[in-house]
């Protein structure tokens, strides 16, 4: 049985000799880099699958660097929202939105040097009645949904990174260990409470959301499947739900910033006393591009 051709923009390139690294870069008409893929990059796919949507939805495999003819397929999507290990969502979409119809370019870099550039035209689906303004409105909301999903997931990643740094030093402060442990326990209690509002921490398997209600990161991510289900202007209801969830998320983020500001200085003072570095308030290792 034959295979269907890949969706999206297909790039063919010929390598006449072995190379270490191939990079394929897509840019829009303003020169902005939309996506960049390298042969030494793993895990290009998103954790969430799109629930419908126009044009391609499959994740992109990294480009190859073999001698001879190589083929790469870009799924015509912007970068994905970040994820974290073990994240479970119910109908949540972390896949980036499809780009707008228009002029793009693709560049091929071989071992860091630009080797070729070609123009690329992304056309609107001829079956769609959506206007250009409709597609722009849809794209803007989908990008906002993706960015807020990243904000929510990065907050969880930051909580887990801060917790790991703080708890990991409990037995390294000698006579100050008891005082340090008390401060860390308070920190952990407060940031864990906010983490549990952003993400359903009880989820351990794909069916767990049936028993435990989804939280704000999943609710925001699920909007992408609704808004991107067809080529059309987003409904007023979709925008209203997004605004409501964004406000809810911001409340949790504000509280987390307050906890870090209030508790970390005392914790870091004790760490400094014992030649330990201050706790870094940032997400742990990035999982998706």
Language-model segments: what does each one mean?
Residues 13, 74, 104, 270-271:
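Conserved structural-core and active-site-/substrate-pathway-adjacent residues in large, well-folded domains
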